[in-house]
């Protein structure tokens, strides 16, 4: 599975086409990685959008990627919000509702099975389930968690976990239903269907191989969820 950046900035459309072509050739399912239109901040800065504006922006980003995917014989299977938008809709009713409405509208081009990838226990998960949207619960291999299940802010030391053994052990624990250690030292159980590893985490490619092998060795079946 491959989440493809969907923000209409720079040479993103060329990259979208190239990524969709590569994914189609390898049988990899495609997800739209929608985000705030924030190139300088890489989509990681909090932004305030009016409800209808965010809904329209999200529909546009999904639609643009969907056109690229269909042009090469595949489709967008799921949507994973990025960065600050992902964190905001975990707790913000208005912005979460705008994203849910956008996915319902995007079904006209992507199909009724279009899924949302979301944090377990979040506002966006609840609203998506209420709207009968398929939900893929997501856990993070390389990010620290607060005790309430939200992600630790990237401005704090230790918010990104890069030590390979620690990452692999966390992922195995989450996949097995065992608790991990939250940022404040308390135990936290994260129920998830999918594991996220950020591409800009140091050593991400090799780390992904280690995670997969660790899961296989632990008896966990690794497969695309959608």
Specify the residue positions occupied by each region the protein language model found:
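Glycine-rich tight-turn/loop motif centered on a GG-T
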Residues: 6-7, 40-55, 89-92, 110, ...
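Acidic (Asp/Glu)-rich catalytic clusters
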Residues: 18-31, 70-72
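Glycine/small-residue-rich loop that forms an oxyanion/phosphate-binding "nest" at active or ligand-binding sites
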Residues: 39-72, 78
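Charged helix-capping and loop-helix junction motifs
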Residues: 92-100
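Active-site rim beta-loop-alpha module in soluble metabolic enzymes
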Residues: 121-179
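C-terminal domain-boundary segment and adjacent tail
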Residues: 206-226
């Amino acid at each position: 599975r491959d989440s493809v950046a969907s923000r209409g900035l720079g040479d993103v459309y060329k990259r979208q086409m190239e990524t969709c072509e590569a994914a189609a050739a390898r049988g990899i399912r495609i997800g739209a990685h929608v985000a705030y239109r924030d190139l300088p901040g890489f989509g990681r800065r909090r932004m305030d959008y009016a409800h209808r504006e965010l809904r329209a922006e999200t529909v546009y980003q999904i639609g643009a990627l969907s056109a690229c995917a269909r042009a090469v014989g595949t489709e967008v299977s799921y949507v994973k919000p990025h960065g600050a938008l992902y964190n905001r809709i975990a707790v913000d009713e208005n912005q979460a509702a705008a994203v849910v409405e956008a996915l319902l509208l995007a079904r006209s081009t992507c199909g009724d099975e279009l899924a949302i990838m979301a944090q377990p226990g979040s506002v966006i998960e609840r609203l998506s389930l209420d709207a009968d949207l398929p939900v893929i619960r997501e856990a993070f291999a390389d990010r620290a968690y607060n005790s309430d299940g939200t992600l630790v802010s990237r401005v704090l030391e230790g918010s990104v976990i890069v030590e390979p053994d620690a990452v692999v052990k966390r992922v195995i624990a989450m996949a097995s239903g065992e608790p991990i250690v939250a940022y404040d030292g308390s135990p936290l159980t994260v129920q998830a269907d999918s594991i996220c590893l950020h591409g800009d985490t140091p050593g991400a490619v090799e780390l992904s191989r280690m995670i997969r092998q660790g899961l296989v060795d632990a008896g966990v079946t690794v497969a695309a969820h959608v």
